[in-house]
Amino acid sequence: MKEFDLESYDYHLPKELIANYPILPKEKAKLLIYERHSQKITHTTFEHVLDFFPKNTLVVLNDTKVIKARLFGSKYAFLPSKTTEVFFHRFLKNNTALTQIKGKIKVGDKIFFDENHYAEVLELLNNGQRLIAFYDNKTPLDQASILKLLEQYGHMPLPPYIKRADESLDTLEYQSVFAKHIGAVAAPTASLHFSQNTLENLLKDFKHTFLTLHVGAGTFASVETKDIREHQIHTEVLHIPKKSQEILQKSQEILCIGTTALRSVEYFKRLKTPKQEAFECDIFLHLANPIQHANYLLTNFHLPKSSLLMLVSAMIGLEKTKEIYQIAIEKKYRFYSYGDGMLIL
């Protein structure tokens, strides 16, 4: 069936529609609204986004905070040039970290960030990932110290389709105004559309709750299995406080700010009797595993053959998704992380 064929999720996007910078002020970004019941499409801007939110819905937001996850170092402490890139993914046990390192590397190699701070390669894992530990003068660093090191020397992890180096504006703009709990290596991009003013109006006028899904590097990975049902999606750390769990369990209608919030809601609501607040979220939503609990979605326009495009198709159907994306292309909407948005009602 074509809805499970990977090639069905391909489309051509003119390069000039890939957003390399955010629209400022945020309210000026374009917004496509699709109402499923009437099949009506409205073109507006984020200045009016809250006017379209159903009044009695629960709005769910992901308050993860992006780490400055890209580090540059050298293999020798005395070398001034920093040409080896370390992309931090997540912490593992005993303060070790899962990373990607560009270039040839072997177990035991050290990568220096200054005269004292360095990382040592502990293990070469499958799929190109590297297990490393961080040190200060041979003393292992704990997680808090590693995060300080990343904040001091790291760069914002802009997506691979943004073909430029990160700039000072990205520290502010590639982070939602409600980002709180550090741990993501990619922004939950629908959240980037909210200015402080829009957020305050949302919190004042709508029922809402927060959860934390630390977006992983796997969010950019394309699906590669010919049958999308065979794809193994990445795992991400999810934290839902007890108060938020109670609100989610009671709510009938849910509007998710972004695919990360939606995946979190779907994962949590399918658990029988969750007793903890921390989870490993690995839910892959597509037409064979459709959305059951979330009712509405605010999202950006996603990459061809991506799991996020399949999630949107699970909500409105493959043909309607392709039709709307073609309209967005014709109307010169800006795509991907810094791009325009779409509200599915």
From Swiss-Prot:
Q: Pathway, according to UniProt? A: tRNA modification; tRNA-queuosine biosynthesis
**Record localization:** Cytoplasm
Identify a single GO molecular function assigned to this protein. Answer: S-adenosylmethionine:tRNA ribosyltransferase-isomerase activity
Q: Got any disulfides in this one, which pairs?
A: none
EC number, UniProt record:
2.4.99.17
Q: What is its main location?
A: cytoplasm
Q: Which GO terms describe its biological process?
A: queuosine biosynthetic process; tRNA wobble guanine modification
- What GO CC annotations are associated with the protein? cytoplasm
Q: Keyword set for this entry?
A: Cytoplasm, Queuosine biosynthesis, S-adenosyl-L-methionine, Transferase
Q: Which NCBIfam families match?
A: PRK00147.1, queA
Q: Give the protein's function.
A: Transfers and isomerizes the ribose moiety from AdoMet to the 7-aminomethyl group of 7-deazaguanine (preQ1-tRNA) to give epoxyqueuosine (oQ-tRNA).
Please report which protein family the annotation says this sequence is part of: Belongs to the QueA family.
Q: What is this protein called?
A: S-adenosylmethionine:tRNA ribosyltransferase-isomerase
